[in-house]
């Protein structure tokens, strides 16, 4: 069955978990799951592609880069078990999109309201850098989610790779001339011809948060803007 034939988010998620399109990434995820990190040696790592997570009727879509090797690749849930997730879920909770401010494991009771989380790549990549070919192979899953998440009005892209891959999955990369495409710069908000609003943000990775490139004030301003836009649109 093709991805286009899938008619529900759960069916897309099952297809993601079974994916074997990228041998390098599958081998890496399995190796990480086998060798583990010392502090997580008692965990049974997920070690498979990570599906999307959240409310299928969401108006907010958050698009990240890829699972972290000892984060979502360990826990099996997007942005769960690492510092990036701590930043994301704390902000989602503060603005009413999450039931709790922490995300530690996929059975911790966390639920999302009016928010769905996806990613450009679904397998943890070595060095946090999926190849262009791997992103191309994975993009149909994001496109399938976009087709089924019919109520989304605002998209937050976390990092340039997520930003550009969302534009490609949504079809805007081809439809818009290079000069008309929404540029990636932290805090920029663009309304597309169909009314969709995309807000770009630096990714809440340690590389950005520990260096001050992304501060808490900058981060929360993104979600304050999201909340304001959704309130305005009803």
List each model region and its residues:
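A polyanion-binding, active-site-adjacent surface
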Residues: 6-233
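Polybasic, lysine-enriched low-complexity intrinsically disordered terminal tails
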Residues: 1-3
């Amino acid at each position: 069955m093709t991805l286009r034939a899938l008619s529900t988010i759960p069916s897309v998620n099952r297809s993601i978990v079974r994916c074997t399109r990228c041998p390098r990434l599958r081998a890496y995820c399995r190796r990480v799951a086998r060798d583990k990190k010392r502090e997580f040696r008692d965990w049974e790592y997920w070690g498979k592609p990570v599906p999307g997570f959240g409310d299928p009727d969401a108006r907010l879509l958050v698009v990240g880069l890829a699972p972290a090797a000892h984060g979502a690749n360990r826990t099996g849930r997007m942005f769960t078990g690492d510092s990036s997730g701590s930043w994301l879920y704390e902000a989602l909770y503060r603005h009413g999109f999450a039931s709790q401010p922490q995300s530690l494991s996929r059975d911790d009771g966390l639920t999302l309201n009016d928010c769905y989380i996806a990613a450009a790549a679904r397998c943890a990549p070595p060095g946090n850098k999926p190849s262009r070919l791997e992103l191309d192979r994975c993009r149909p899953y994001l496109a399938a989610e976009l087709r089924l998440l019919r109520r989304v009005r605002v998209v937050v892209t976390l990092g340039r790779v997520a930003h550009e891959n969302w534009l490609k999955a949504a079809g805007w990369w081809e439809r818009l001339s290079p000069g008309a495409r929404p540029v990636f710069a932290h805090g920029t908000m663009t309304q597309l011809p169909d009314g969709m609003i995309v807000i770009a943000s630096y990714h809440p990775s340690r590389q950005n948060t520990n260096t001050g490139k992304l501060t808490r004030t900058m981060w929360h301003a993104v979600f304050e803007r999201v909340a304001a836009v959704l309130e305005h649109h009803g």
